[in-house]
Amino acid sequence: QELVDVEGKTVRNGGTYYLVPQLRPGGGGMEAAKVGNEDCPLTVVKSLDENSNGEPIRIASRLRSTFIPEYSLVNLGFADPPKCAPSPFWTVVKDQSERLPSIKLGEYKDSELDYPFKFERVYAASKMYAYKLLYCGSEDEEEEMMCKDIGVYRDQEGYQRLVVSKHNPLVVGFKKAESSTT
């Protein structure tokens, strides 16, 4: 089965979408924020504004198809990233100062992890398609590669960070971004 957006249409490989939370309440879509000592907005967070779709995100699979099959590995990147960011692509960074590995904008260190995420359907009822976002990789060299939920962690500054977590999985839907580039 292929990924389907909130309107019941097939998610296009390389297309641009908003990732909007499907469980309310709890904030809006995904965006980049300056967190901690960052000089540039590099940390991926859920918007605190429930009415915000967040920033448009390009979703791509290495498969040569027009659609994205469910459970296939994908890369995610902001369609219009901050100019100061090293890359538009989402990656997982384990920082000693943070409790959980966070999703940030950055370069991949390993070509195997060029497509480190996947979506797993949670439920589909009355045209409501919702998916968990998972990170498929290892956080250190000794650890075996496996898929783990991406959850939300509210930090001391009040940001709702996207983190690799066993608790509070993020459940999203795909909302097509209106743009001349999609």
Curated annotation (Swiss-Prot):
It holds the Pfam family Kunitz_legume. Gene3D superfamilies: 2.80.10.50. The record marks 64-65 as: Reactive bond for trypsin. GO terms for molecular function: serine-type endopeptidase inhibitor activity. It comes from the Eukaryota. SUPFAM superfamilies: STI-like (SSF50386). This is Trypsin inhibitor 2. It comes from Psophocarpus tetragonolobus. The lineage of its organism: Eukaryota, Viridiplantae, Streptophyta, Embryophyta, Tracheophyta.
